[in-house]
Amino acid sequence: MLSLDAARDFNGHIVNADSMQLYRDMDIGTAKLSHSARQGIPHHQIDVIDPSSEASVARYKLSAQTCIKHIHALNSIPFLVGGSGLYVSSVVHNLQFPPTDGRVRKLLEDEADKSGIGVLHDRLLKLHPGFTVSRGNRRRIIRALEVAYITGRSPNPVLPLQNRANNFIVINLICDKGTLDIRLQKRVESFYDNGLIDEVRLLQEKYVLGRTAAKAIGYKQAIMYLAGEISCADAKDSTLQETIRLANKQIKWFRRYSGQHIVDTTDMSVAYEQIRSILNKSFRIS
């Protein structure tokens, strides 16, 4: 992998920025590297919360920043790798997040359970007509209302993507659509070939899965398959379609970053030479 090659050659540590790899025991469906595959390179922000809990980007940002300071203190280089657009941006751009209130959140969760998330969605749009969110995105709707009630302000986040913290070097890995489609299809096939269904079965025996874990791409489909709601073929197809949508969303997100280095990964060996050149110049290594 390109990140492992870079960390190996530049005395680096990997700091995970994939929100789903934060969860313990969710390995196959998140494409988490095994310990042996990590080649002895230190990895951070992996397996840090149970699937029964809910990840928080605000908590993640603070933890990741602490990791980065620790890595710098070791005279090593942190490689933030991922992943989830908001999680990456939270660190790279030092985003500030509104406060939380567990009491308000609980009231909203209970109301959504009783009356349906559509009621809360309608209320949110009445309060802030310009806010855009899918009617079925329960977590984001509840968080938006929580922010609106606590602060009295619009829940729309302001993402200062022109301002970068900590002198990050941003390398955006791209490839043509045909190559991407093939890679995504192979990725999804590997999930099921490597035992995603069994992994989900064990997760259900060990944990009461939280909303995020239960709705994760691949895991949601495996849960539906185990419940007899869909066939294995339909589970695979749905996983692939959601994976493609997520990839397209990530492409659009990272395209907005200013001052980024774009590297075509169609040929991985060529791509790594470009990455090495970028890092050599940035670190002034001859």
From Swiss-Prot:
Q: Which reaction(s) are listed as its catalytic activity?
A: adenosine(37) in tRNA + dimethylallyl diphosphate = N(6)-dimethylallyladenosine(37) in tRNA + diphosphate
**Region spans: Interaction with substrate tRNA:** 18-21
Keyword Transferase set for record: yes
EC number(s) per entry: 2.5.1.75
* Top EC group: transferase
UniProt GO MF annotations: ATP binding; tRNA dimethylallyltransferase activity
Biological processes, Gene Ontology terms: tRNA modification
Q: Which cofactor does it need?
A: Mg(2+)
Keyword Ion transport included in the entry's annotation: no
- Keywords of this protein's UniProt record, alphabetized? ATP-binding, Magnesium, Nucleotide-binding, Transferase, tRNA processing
Which Pfam families does the record match to this protein? IPPT
Q: Where is this site: Interaction with substrate tRNA?
A: 84, 105
The cross-references to PANTHER family, in alphabetical order and at most eight, read:
TRNA DIMETHYLALLYLTRANSFERASE
Which HAMAP family has this protein been placed in? Answer: IPP_trans (MF_00185)
Function, in words:
Catalyzes the transfer of a dimethylallyl group onto the adenine at position 37 in tRNAs that read codons beginning with uridine, leading to the formation of N6-(dimethylallyl)adenosine (i(6)A).
Concerning its family, UniProt says: Belongs to the IPP transferase family.
How the protein assembles, per its UniProt entry? Monomer.
Protein name as catalogued: tRNA dimethylallyltransferase
Give the species: Tropheryma whipplei (strain TW08/27) (Whipple's bacillus)
Top-level taxonomy: Bacteria, Bacillati, Actinomycetota, Actinomycetes, Micrococcales
